[in-house]
């Protein structure tokens, strides 16, 4: 059962409508972090008591006997800028921690506070256009780490860690798609990786622009807590005359990155242990064919990219 709460902080009131009596005080604090930027450990919620004592983080909201739309006061200082708070966590093996996003989608995709964050990115995030968008082209958005190359293995050059057929894949895709790179890292590292791989200097294709972690947003999921995602709405908002849900596809090895846009995401198999798999991995070859097939369509909304291999086999069998 939903338990609407109004939280006052910094002269403003924040409406919390997505938590239930089964959620905990910590869930509330984590949600408030997404709204205010104040870290949970810095928050003090006045009026939340159990048996006369301040409620601990593990106490369920139902135990507080709150009436709907109860107003509570939050004290706490935002010690970091909002952008820092919303940025990605320190580097870890996201592939191990990935989860199936399907059950979370309905609760997250259209939530008002997430859409407001996207609007803020559209207004504030600066995109450096490397090559102008082309009229009539579809959009391919690509992750970098484990999608285009193995960023964990050691090698003398980046080329040794590059996913097989990368340049052939991008050359073919460029015929039908504008290409955008989006990585959950700092722009200077993205630029360095693209240069090392020979992507930014290849004469056979061009990159339209690149996005870094500052274009991402943090969303709260009821069961998984806070996660960072890549909302395609940032691109659609900035380039609405060229790109939309109908003509965009995004490749990423981490499914939760397209939690805000599940219809447009294709979860690619991660490319790891390059020295062992360099001669075996043919993922980009097959995806080259898939992109070529769906480029014939006027609208991608009828596709389910989860079954892209089935779709490709069916088309090639005709």
From Swiss-Prot:
The modification N6-acetyllysine is found at residue 117. Keywords: Acetylation, Hydrolase, Magnesium, Metal-binding, Nucleus, Protein phosphatase. One of its GO terms (molecular function) is metal ion binding. Its cofactor is Mg(2+). PROSITE patterns: FCP1, UBIQUITIN_2. The keyword Cell inner membrane does not apply. One of its GO terms (biological process) is regulation of proteasome assembly. It is found in: Nucleus. Residues 133-294 form the FCP1 homology domain. Residues 3-81 form the Ubiquitin-like domain. The Ubiquitin-like domain mediates interaction with proteasomes. Mg(2+) binds at residues 143, 145, 253. Its main location: nucleus. It is an enzyme of class 3 (hydrolase). This is Ubiquitin-like domain-containing CTD phosphatase 1. The modification N-acetylalanine is found at residue 2. Its EC number is 3.1.3.16. The gene is UBLCP1. InterPro entries: FCP1_dom, HAD-like_sf, HAD-SF_hydro_IIID, HAD_sf, Ubiquitin-like_dom, Ubiquitin-like_domsf, UBLCP1. One of its GO terms (cellular component) is nucleus. It catalyses: O-phospho-L-seryl-[protein] + H2O = L-seryl-[protein] + phosphate; O-phospho-L-threonyl-[protein] + H2O = L-threonyl-[protein] + phosphate. Dephosphorylates 26S nuclear proteasomes, thereby decreasing their proteolytic activity. Recruited to the 19S regulatory particle of the 26S proteasome through its interaction with 19S component PSMD2/RPN1. Once recruited, dephosphorylates 19S component PSMC2/RPT1 which impairs PSMC2 ATPase activity and disrupts 26S proteasome assembly. Has also been reported to stimulate the proteolytic activity of the 26S proteasome. The keyword S-adenosyl-L-methionine does not apply.
């Amino acid at each position: 059962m939903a338990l609407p709460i109004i939280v006052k902080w910094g002269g403003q009131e924040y409406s919390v409508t997505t938590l239930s009596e089964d959620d905990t005080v910590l869930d509330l604090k984590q949600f408030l972090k997404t709204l205010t930027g104040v870290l949970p450990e810095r928050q003090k919620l006045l009026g939340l008591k159990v048996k006369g004592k301040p409620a601990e983080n593990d106490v369920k909201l139902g135990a507080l006997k709150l009436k709907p739309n109860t107003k509570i006061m939050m004290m706490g200082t935002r010690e970091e800028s909002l952008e820092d708070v919303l940025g990605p966590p320190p580097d870890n093996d996201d592939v191990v921690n990935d989860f199936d996003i399907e059950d979370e989608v309905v609760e997250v995709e259209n939530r008002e506070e997430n859409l407001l964050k996207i609007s803020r990115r559209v207004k504030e995030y600066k995109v450096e256009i490397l090559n102008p968008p082309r009229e009539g082209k579809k959009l391919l958005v690509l992750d970098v780490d484990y999608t285009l190359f193995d960023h964990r293995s050691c090698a003398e050059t980046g080329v040794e860690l590059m996913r097989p057929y990368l340049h052939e894949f991008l050359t073919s895709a460029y015929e039908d798609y504008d290409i955008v790179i989006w990585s959950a890292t700092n722009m200077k590292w993205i630029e360095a990786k693209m240069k090392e791989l020979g992507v930014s200097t290849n004469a056979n294709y061009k990159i339209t622009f690149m996005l870094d972690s500052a274009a991402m947003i943090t969303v709260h999921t009821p069961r998984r807590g806070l996660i960072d995602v890549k909302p395609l709405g940032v691109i659609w908002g900035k380039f609405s005359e060229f790109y939309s849900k109908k003509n965009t596809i995004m490749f990423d090895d981490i499914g939760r990155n397209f939690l805000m846009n599940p219809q447009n995401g294709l979860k690619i198999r991660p490319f790891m242990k390059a020295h062992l798999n360099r001669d075996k991995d043919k993922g980009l070859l097959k995806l080259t064919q898939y992109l070529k097939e769906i480029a014939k369509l006027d609208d991608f909304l009828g596709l389910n990219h989860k079954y892209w291999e089935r779709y490709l086999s069916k088309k090639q069998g005709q």
